[in-house]
UniProtKB/Swiss-Prot annotation:
<keyword id="KW-0408">Iron</keyword>
<keyword id="KW-0808">Transferase</keyword>
<dbReference type="GO" id="GO:0061711">
    <property type="term" value="F:N(6)-L-threonylcarbamoyladenine synthase activity"/>
</dbReference>
<dbReference type="InterPro" id="IPR022450">
    <property type="entry name" value="TsaD"/>
</dbReference>
<keyword id="KW-0012">Acyltransferase</keyword>
<dbReference type="GO" id="GO:0005506">
    <property type="term" value="F:iron ion binding"/>
</dbReference>
<feature type="binding site">
    <location>
        <position position="274"/>
    </location>
    <ligand>
        <name>substrate</name>
    </ligand>
</feature>
<comment type="function">
    <text>Required for the formation of a threonylcarbamoyl group on adenosine at position 37 (t(6)A37) in tRNAs that read codons beginning with adenine. Is involved in the transfer of the threonylcarbamoyl moiety of threonylcarbamoyl-AMP (TC-AMP) to the N6 group of A37, together with TsaE and TsaB. TsaD likely plays a direct catalytic role in this reaction.</text>
</comment>
<dbReference type="InterPro" id="IPR000905">
    <property type="entry name" value="Gcp-like_dom"/>
</dbReference>
<feature type="binding site">
    <location>
        <position position="118"/>
    </location>
    <ligand>
        <name>Fe cation</name>
    </ligand>
</feature>
<keyword id="KW-0479">Metal-binding</keyword>
<dbReference type="InterPro" id="IPR017861">
    <property type="entry name" value="KAE1/TsaD"/>
</dbReference>
<keyword id="KW-0963">Cytoplasm</keyword>
<dbReference type="InterPro" id="IPR043129">
    <property type="entry name" value="ATPase_NBD"/>
</dbReference>
<feature type="binding site">
    <location>
        <position position="186"/>
    </location>
    <ligand>
        <name>substrate</name>
    </ligand>
</feature>
<feature type="binding site">
    <location>
        <begin position="140"/>
        <end position="144"/>
    </location>
    <ligand>
        <name>substrate</name>
    </ligand>
</feature>
<dbReference type="GO" id="GO:0005737">
    <property type="term" value="C:cytoplasm"/>
</dbReference>
Length: 333
């Protein structure tokens, strides 16, 4: 089978303008050739992402980031054989920028266009890095998502558990903000936690005794707020919160791995960069696979990888009428 060689991927689902290029070899193997991300620092002053502002920033940056990605790959736009872009889930206005840009580029080049699911992109960011074959569990944990999937076969996704309230990354952001540690909260919490004492601010494990594999972070947020009001040191608060969140994520995932008989867990999304989370999984009985450098947070290379997977699986290109969707369950394809 002859595959399109160079695939461009675009992700504008939130506040990062990501464009990447992968090379799909005749044997089906795939290699990331470029991955460029423009992170919108303007949102830091607001303590969170402003959707309309994010959309405007994408419009201003996407052409430049695309050019940078092509230059990094040593290619011209005419070398592209397919284009993939995130269609959801995410901020609709932001998604539309990348989606319309990708469609227009594919149409101008007369090459196939593939609408990609943001969560599938995160999964492939780790799975492709290790040339991993199903079956495995996939934990996608980021600022907007906390989902646990069983992946019995490539392209088949069974939702095992999900957050009942906040996503893990969102909880990190909110706790960091109330403790005055800055934004984004993930790196801020991780850095402060190194200087803190987790025993100084104890947190109870959420959803104790549950038979399923769901997540919840509202209780940890409330406990952090109460500790802050009681005068807890920011670094101790960060240490206690991080330890509780990591134990909860890892413990729930390990229970699911035992229940589904999986020995390998893919861990992806922005929170996957957390040092404590990686160390906890490394010490666990499962094989934990994480994305490579630059592929944890939102990026275009992971969408190009999802496009490559669609091509290898023989999926038909997406219609140019494909729209952006804010909420899109990851269905088996």
């Amino acid at each position: 089978m002859t595959f399109p060689r160079y695939i461009l991927g675009i992700d504008t689902s939130c506040d990062d303008t990501g464009v990447g290029v992968v090379e799909l070899a005749p044997d089906g193997s795939v290699q990331v050739r470029a991955n460029r991300v423009w992170s919108q620092t303007v949102h830091a002053q607001y303590g969170g992402v402003l959707p309309e502002l994010a959309s405007r920033e994408h419009v201003e940056r996407i052409d430049t980031v695309t050019g940078d990605a092509l230059a990094e790959a040593g290619l011209t736009v005419g070398d592209l054989a397919a284009v993939a872009a995130t269609s959801g889930p995410g901020l609709v206005g932001a998604l539309l920028v990348g989606l319309m840009y990708g469609k227009g580029l594919a149409q101008a080049l007369n090459v196939p266009f593939y609408a990609a699911h943001h969560l599938e992109g995160h999964i492939f960011a780790a799975a492709s890095e290790a040339d991993l074959q199903a079956p495995y569990l996939a934990l996608v944990v980021s600022g907007g998502h906390t989902h646990l999937f069983d992946v019995p076969r490539e392209g088949e996704y069974v939702l095992v558990g999900a957050t009942r309230d906040d996503a893990a990354g969102e909880a990190f952001d909110k706790v960091a903000r109330l403790a005055g540690l800055g934004y984004p909260g993930g790196p801020a919490i991780s850095e402060a936690a190194r200087r803190g004492d987790p025993e100084a601010v104890p947190f109870k494990e959420p959803l104790q005794g549950q038979k399923g594999f769901d997540f919840s972070f509202s209780g940890l947020k409330t406990a952090a707020l109460l500790a802050h009001r009681a005068g807890a040191k920011p670094e101790d608060l960060a240490a206690g919160f991080e330890r509780a969140a990591v134990r909860f994520l890892v413990g729930t995932t390990l229970r699911a791995a035992r229940a589904y008989g999986r020995e390998t867990v893919v861990v992806s999304g922005g929170v996957a960069a957390n040092r404590a989370l990686r160390e906890a999984f490394a010490a666990s009985p499962v094989r934990a696979v994480f994305p490579g450098k630059g592929l944890n947070t939102d990026n275009g290379a992971m969408i190009a990888l999802a496009g490559a997977a669609a091509i290898r699986a023989g999926r038909a290109p997406s219609p140019l009428s494909e729209g952006a969707v804010a909420y899109a369950p990851l269905a088996s394809v």
